[in-house]
């Protein structure tokens, strides 16, 4: 019934019941009798009665059946949101997702390297013979053949007729010769003069893209700064319609629905600050425990710009920049200056023209050979022709002549103009000229023609002689012809300047030459030696009248003391003195002993002067030492004024000049003169070529024009050190550039010299400038005459370290005469640094008492050249040496260096005040100052109107530990707790005392059925046991499980089986038991108890704690009442094992055990004996493996010729034919652009372009990130945060007091299966089982190796099968062939498939008894035997010397460290810390010998790839080495070459008798070595290091390498494959810190420690070695 009809049906029932009830009383009123007797009222229906009173409500009916399901009601209003649920526990890790879809195909890879060449293919079959081809085209005429060999030598000709005049007679002209071969191209001529400049060319097309650059530096894996906020994006498309959720608070009205949510509006302006909220609820007055540090907050807003920071340290290497665009092509260069004319060739007319020879190969220019020995004297030549001879060289200047007679008076005062002087040396650069007018814009022109060749360079130093060549083979038939000349070679490099040859033997005297032309006047000669005194001269002419006497001069300096005069004559007796006082009367004593000699008496008064003695003639005494500076004399009275002189009346006519006086002494150096005007130098007519002057005496010529670029010369030998350059002027401070990578720039081109400037006023003495750059090495000068000794110069930089000289002091020689001054030697090479001494014991702070002077030491080796000392006082003049021999006149020396300034003159009078000086140049930027003190706290900044939520502040420091609370009173006993959980097993108690040995036990009862044992772990094969006694024959075992497939044994002989037929298949095995539950991990060691904290607030009741350990026994209480019966006690500790009991009865047979693991495959069995013939045929064999393909047979004989076949398929493409004849010209092709060609190879590298125009100004660079700003004021209170994650579990509570043992509970549920028990002893042998069913047929075994067959001829391996061809038409049968040669035996085929079973054969006869079988496998292990008696005492072990325990010690200096006492060195080397290749680091343990490489290089490794290619130092890999305390250079430039040696630490590998370990204290105290260990060294605990790309490695703390003897914040240096090393700011070292033991298990306090206090926070350590006993 439908649900709609159910209510109608109920209404119908109710109406029916009401009608029935209403009808019953109406029926009794229908018939009324009114006294007329009995009426029969049957059948009359009365009227309808009145409506009755409604009856009382009936009882409720029975509960009806549930009606059908009603219609779904309307959706109710949404309920109010529920309270947020608690955060659920962390979910279980989800199942690993399905593998993702395959990604889009990657970009095509770069083409791989060409693979290695494949193996040669197998030789193909011989093809069939082809048909005869068409005749070929006639070939092109061949090249002319080589000339044939020379013909036989002709007969000797007749003698020529001619006159013997020294000329060869010239014959008649011969017949015209055969035209010669075409000559080979001659050497290229000299370049012609430059043509006129061409018109400007068009701009060239841009060049092809260059090859990919080398791999850049590895970037550091650092996170970049947060980028700037991007611009607001465009409004996105409208999203999908959202779900509207709202809460009805009033009757539902459809009109209350809102439309869809509009797009998100633009961000509004910040609103005004809201009113301050009500105070929050207080949840307890106590401050909570500090929370865990929160997650990292969002990055803060940019603060106000700070003050400019100081210049930062050098930054890390940046990422490699993007590749720049190609620069604009440079402008066309200027036309080069014209070159010098080429060498002049002279034509000698007297040479006879020879026959035309074959052109020879032009040989390369050989190196200049050494001077040969002088040849024998030649035959005297015939008299020379009277041609003018070459001008001889200018002779040496003659000696100074004696003084000539007085010459006649000169005629003119002014002489004729002298010859044109040499051009002066270039003056100092002049001031910069005014800016020029702007130049015209010129188009870029193509580069000009090459200029003329430049001057020929000086000849180079001769190269070293090559090794001696192999002796050539003797020439047997030398009919060789010179080959055609090759292409002319490049001109050879100029040879190195040769060593001057020895003096040659004087040649024979030549014929007298014709007189030469007048030579140039010679240079002024050097002053000659002082002549002997001349004869007395004639009386001189009357001098001119004397001048007036001048004013008296200033008193001179005090003179040197004079020589000691001769003794004067003794003076006369002195005058009589006055009478003395009266003496006391003397006692008459006896004569005394002679007294000692008295002291010398005082000098008497000086006597009167004696008469003058005769002049002394003693030898001249040595001048005394220079006296001390005298006291300046008293200023004398001013002298009287002299008379005014008469005016001079002399006329300008001078008298005749007097004789030249003797050369005066050199006057003091005058002031520098003013520069003269620039002289005009009209060029004179060119004179004849002069002869070469004295070598190196002429003035240097003007610089020649720039020559063409020569071929690169060989590397020259190092030049002599140049003079120290003058200090350069300080440059203008440049704008600070962006931080660049250190690079090596190319040297700039030298500028042109400026015009000479006027001499400026002398400035004040400036500070000493930085040393200038070293000058270019000068050409070494010839030795000049010794100048006067100069004052010591400025201290020079120390010379390069020389190699250590061998210093063996010889016997002392006699004093030699003073030698001549030798030439200055080259500075010696730097000696090796001596080894570093062992560190001494630290001395006390006080200085000790000075010791006695030691004995004089042996003279030491000469030390290194120190820096020149300060200027010393002038020394005393030395003894005059004997006159040297007269030397040869030296070459004209170069002008000497400027002498030192003279002694200061007396101070002049004060000059007038000078004019105002030019303002000085801007000083260089000072070094950044030291970091200032922290400033006072600033005022609060202006309030921000937008009160956005501030960033989360950094966690505050941990508060101090509070004082411990007072001890509380003892509490009342608590209520008994609920029944505790089952406790964890307690810790094992201490072992009890050993029990008495038990008596021998009774035999045990049979045990219960054991559980099936679990499978044991496969044991290690034990050692081979002794051979046991022969056991009784065992019962037949069960058939074993199928083993792993062993290797296929040799094929046995065909066996026999007696009537075994396959049984039915066995039942399916039992399902295996569930796997074991894993073992519970061991309990960790309890930590030490922490300090008691202050009492916290009452916590919520905790969850029931884990039962505690049993407490210690308390004090004895009062005797209690007798207790109830106690609970059973815990089991006692296990006693000692009793004697073994009697063997128990055998238990019932256990259940079937699990299947054991597969056994280790056994070795292949030996070949069995041939079985006897069986009675029944065996079962059907397994199908054999198909046999290998047989060898190819010998080809058969040829058959009869077949019929002509149908035309076959088109054959493969034939080889290319010969070139055809040229065809007729084709029609003009259509102009269709072809497809774009492949990309060409990258072009050759072009010449560098000229510099482009300056680019536009770059963007304004951002400054370096400033220091962290000061902490701002606290932000407004943040909104309440979301509920945090569930905190970590708290620390375990203190152990509770142990509860009373509970009443024994109900038996628990069955427990989990227990931990897997140990393997039980093997059970006794069970009864023999029934034979098992035959297992299923196994898979066929692997194919056996082919047997060895002796074949007659080994056929080649067959090639791979070709593609099957189309079947051809069937040909006619050929003729019968001859029988073929039998082929070699093929290899044995694989066994064929099993044949169908044959019919059973007849029963065989009974076989003989089989041979004795081989020894069976060893039986089960027996029970362990009884304990044996103790053995005899062994011999004591012998000690050894060194056991080969290796460790490495690093000095962290350039000294090689010594091995500690008791160890010996193996080798020394350089300290390698770690390497980094392909951005991955690999470290070395500094305690092992792998960290001590015997050779140092900045790139000690290379890398190889799968293409058999290895690359060395060709990409950006690194190596890191322990470094020394040497400071890095001031300019932070990378270090390379020999300059690296002072930066690399040395190391020694040592061998000791025992193991070496490192012990770390984690404090600043040095830890002691363990007992019976000795100390090797002490140091600092080094644990880890990182550098480029945050890659690095670490040290094992047990290794001696973790204990470095010296602490450095930067203990290692970074080196690169390009040969440079440096320290970089991203290198970090990690050390163990020193810890306060009271701070364990607490939050570490952050701190920063600066240099000077670093050793106070580093853990100390000691390396120890076990003692030898």
UniProtKB/Swiss-Prot annotation:
Residues 255-269, 922-939 have a biased composition (Basic and acidic residues). The record marks 1424-1425 as: Cleavage. One of its GO terms (biological process) is endothelial cell apoptotic process. It comes from the Eukaryota. Residues 1425-1443 are annotated as: Epitope recognized by Goodpasture antibodies. Pfam families: C4, Collagen. Prolines at the third position of the tripeptide repeating unit (G-X-Y) are hydroxylated in some or all of the chains. Type IV collagens contain numerous cysteine residues which are involved in inter- and intramolecular disulfide bonding. 12 of these, located in the NC1 domain, are conserved in all known type IV collagens. It is found in: Secreted, Extracellular space, Extracellular matrix, Basement membrane. Residues 43-1436 are annotated as: Triple-helical region. Disruption phenotype: Mice exhibit normal pregnancy and wound healing, but consistent with the human hereditary disorder Alport syndrome they develop a progressive glomerulonephritis with microhematuria and proteinuria. One of its GO terms (molecular function) is extracellular matrix structural constituent. The keyword Phosphoprotein applies. Keywords: Basement membrane, Cell adhesion, Collagen, Disulfide bond, Extracellular matrix, Glycoprotein, Phosphoprotein, Repeat, Secreted, Signal. Disulfide bonds join 1459-1550, 1492-1547, 1504-1510, 1569-1664, 1603-1661, 1615-1621. Glycans are attached at residues 126, 253. Belongs to the type IV collagen family. This is Collagen alpha-3(IV) chain. The lineage of its organism: Eukaryota, Metazoa, Chordata, Craniata, Vertebrata. The gene is Col4a3.
